[in-house]
């Protein structure tokens, strides 16, 4: 993993941009037919601090092997205003022992006439996913916004202060193949839009796309206590939940730090 930040700063303004890269090789999993089957689980909860459920945004990637994460970020702040954002890209490649799996199926109902036919009926593809957010805040009264040089982050409110904030975020866990059809009763995509029992291996990943917009008000009593109110509208696009589209979240938090 590697990350870097470039910053320009004067007395009342700060601007920084950053980039990050991470690589992971998956070497754990479960053994099936004497073959190690790796898997990568992806998921995200709604933007709330009280429910970590990832049922609406989740995906499982069997045979995942190499994971590449690339990110970029920016932050700009003045004494009374800030805006920041981040973009994240994930690419996953897969790997498996086709020969061993093909031989393990010989003589069974799942057997194929040749390795090439087995590979055609059980295709293996790569997947890509995206995510991003942008946020802005305006301080109505209180001490100026402060920037942490050591952490490359905007510091929290310090002293009595009132701010309004707005945020938009996107999480994309859909990687769908054009023409494939999703059958809710089987929770499965079918190649070429054809409903078939055998073979029916799909390359589509329908983990869900979520757009979220938030408006909030934060009031700080002092550097130790703060109350935060926010409303978030979420829009879900996932074939598995065709009738679950709109989610509304109203939150209130009282935070103490010492």
Ranges and model annotations:
Residues 16-18:
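Active-site regions of oxyanion-processing enzymes, predominantly non-cytosolic
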Residues 7-8, 23:
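Short, well-ordered alpha-helical segments in soluble proteins
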Residues 31-258:
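Outer-membrane beta-barrel pore domains
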Residues 1-6:
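Short, small-residue-biased leader/transition segments that mark boundaries at the very start
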Residues 20-28:
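Outer-membrane beta-barrel translocator/channel fold
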């Amino acid at each position: 993993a590697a990350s870097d930040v470039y910053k320009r700063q004067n007395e009342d303004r700060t601007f920084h941009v950053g980039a990050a890269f991470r690589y992971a090789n998956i070497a754990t999993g479960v053994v099936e037919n004497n073959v190690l089957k790796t898997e990568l689980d992806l998921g995200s909860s709604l933007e709330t601090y009280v429910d970590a459920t990832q049922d609406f945004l989740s995906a499982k990637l069997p045979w995942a092997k190499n994971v590449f994460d690339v990110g970029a970020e920016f932050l700009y702040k003045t004494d009374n205003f800030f805006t920041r954002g981040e973009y994240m890209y994930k690419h996953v490649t897969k790997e498996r022992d086709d020969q061993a799996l093909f031989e393990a199926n010989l003589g069974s109902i799942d057997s194929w006439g040749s390795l090439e036919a087995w590979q055609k009926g059980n295709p293996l593809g790569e997947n890509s996913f995206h995510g991003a957010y942008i946020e802005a805040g305006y301080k109505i009264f209180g001490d100026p916004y402060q920037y942490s040089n050591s952490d490359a982050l905007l510091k929290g409110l310090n002293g009595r202060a009132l701010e309004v904030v707005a945020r938009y975020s996107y999480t994309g866990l859909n990687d769908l193949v054009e023409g494939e059809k999703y059958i809710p009763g089987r929770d499965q995509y079918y190649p070429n839009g054809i409903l078939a029992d055998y073979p029916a291996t799909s390359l589509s990943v329908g983990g869900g796309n979520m757009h979220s917009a938030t408006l909030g008000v934060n009031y700080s009593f002092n550097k130790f206590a703060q109350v935060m109110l926010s409303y978030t509208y979420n829009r879900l696009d996932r074939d598995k939940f065709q009738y679950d589209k709109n989610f509304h979240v109203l939150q209130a938090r009282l935070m103490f730090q010492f």
